[in-house]
Regions:
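C-terminal segment of classical bacterial N-terminal signal peptides
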Residues: 20-29
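Bacterial N-terminal signal peptides that target proteins for export
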Residues: 2-14
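Surface-exposed amphipathic alpha-helical segments
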Residues: 165-192
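Short, solvent-exposed recognition patches
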Residues: 35-164
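Generic short N-terminal amphipathic or hydrophobic helices
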Residues: 6-9, 25, 33
Length: 192
């Protein structure tokens, strides 16, 4: 074989590549009839996962069935390994709006003990409040506005709000940090 790259390095190189990338690319059930090569190629091109965070799986069908605006949900949620399980609860969903609570109990109504955060979107109209707060940059040259939390007897959500294609999106975390909110916003995907 007339090659400048010795064949003895190919096997370790391929093994290293598979170990580094294979477990993070996809998790596909062959019974679904999904072409794995197409999914891998699309994910490599997009540079992010096409699946939303598993916490949203129980509510996806309700959101998709009701709302007509583009659904954007984060793949990244900054929750510690020792935290209790996180649940998503649809608070409101109409054709032009959705509001999702993130809580530590399946029946959390955003209460102080069980609330973790919130995600919302609404079609921009003349009644939609303009985003307020400190201007920050997201990926793809999107501008967002950070509104810090306030504490009294309890702490409120810190919020990050941006507009995209006529829809205003907000992600909030109870006493959340700007860096966590930016990571969440930069990880949003539209569920497939």
């Amino acid at each position: 074989m007339n090659s400048k790259f010795p064949i003895k390095y190919i096997s370790p190189l391929c093994t290293s590549f598979l170990l580094l990338t294979g477990t993070n690319l996809i998790r596909v059930t062959p019974a679904l009839g999904i072409d794995q090569h197409q999914i891998i190629a699309k994910q490599l091109i997009k540079g992010k996962k096409s699946q939303v965070n598993q916490v949203f799986q129980p509510i996806l069908s309700k959101l998709k069935k009701t709302t007509q605006i583009k659904i954007l949900l984060p793949t990244h949620i900054p929750i510690g390994k020792n935290e209790p399980p996180l649940y998503s609860i649809v608070e409101t969903v109409t054709k032009n709006k959705y509001q999702i609570l993130l809580g530590f109990t399946p029946d959390c109504g955003g209460g102080t003990a069980c609330g973790f955060g919130a995600i919302s979107a609404e079609l921009v109209s003349s009644n939609t409040p303009k985003p307020v707060g400190k201007e920050v940059n997201l990926n793809n040259n999107k501008k967002a506005y950070f509104e810090d939390f306030k504490c009294g007897a309890n702490c409120s959500n810190a919020n990050l709000t941006w507009r995209e294609k006529g829809v205003q999106y907000t992600i909030g975390l109870k006493a959340g940090s700007l860096s966590d909110l930016v990571k969440m916003a930069n990880s949003v995907v539209s569920p497939t």
